[in-house]
Amino acid sequence: MDPFLVLLHSLSGSLSGNDLMELKFLCRERVSKRKLERVQSGLDLFTVLLEQNDLERGHTGLLRELLASLRRHDLLQRLDDFEAGTATAAPPGEADLQVAFDIVCDNVGRDWKRLARELKVSEAKMDGIEEKYPRSLSERVRESLKVWKNAEKKNASVAGLVKALRTCRLNLVADLVEEAQESVSKSENMSPVLRDSTVSSSETP
């Protein structure tokens, strides 16, 4: 899986509705009004920018500028990690889990303990997580997912996480995770075409 596409999907899943509206406003001079009207998610917008060669794997200046305008320092940190090589160093399956973790953290709040119990996180571990993050539900979710992943090691998978979500009746979140995997796969399948078109256009005299 292309780590850059994984990064874009991760960023998209963490954008609020207001964030998306602001991004569309910021891109109004780069993207036609017709295309912007079709944009329903951050990934939609990133895909358009990729197609127009305004955004490339090796040139993330525009992406950094957009995230800075949103004042989303957390997302800028993800971009920093990617550029530092953290994302590309991830083993197979790690990138898929990272996307799933981001979605779960953004959409599971007060039900985090129910999910943690289903993932076999001990009560003692949960108590420690609560003490460590007394004010952040999303960080509690992320920490509990890390505990599960560390315990499962190579057996930790998106499929296992989705199964736990559905057992907890968090079906909407499970659907979002599955849709994210499908969307990343489709984007990845399209990426060679984008690369070929980029090369062709650059070779045209």
From Swiss-Prot:
Domain notes: Contains a death domain involved in the binding of the corresponding domain within Fas receptor. The interaction between the FAS and FADD death domains is crucial for the formation of the death-inducing signaling complex (DISC).
Name recorded for this polypeptide: FAS-associated death domain protein
GO CC annotations, alphabetized: CD95 death-inducing signaling complex; cell body; ripoptosome
Ranges for domain Death: 97-181
Pfam family of the protein (one): DED
Known partners and oligomeric status: Can self-associate. Component of the AIM2 PANoptosome complex, a multiprotein complex that drives inflammatory cell death (PANoptosis). Component of the death-induced signaling complex (DISC) composed of cell surface receptor FAS/CD95 or TNFRSF1A, adapter protein FADD and the CASP8 protease; recruitment of CASP8 to the complex is required for processing of CASP8 into the p18 and p10 subunits. Interacts (via death domain) with FAS (via death domain).
Domain of life, per lineage: Eukaryota
InterPro entries: DEATH-like_dom_sf (IPR011029), Death_dom (IPR000488), DED_dom (IPR001875), FADD (IPR016729), FADD_vert (IPR049634)
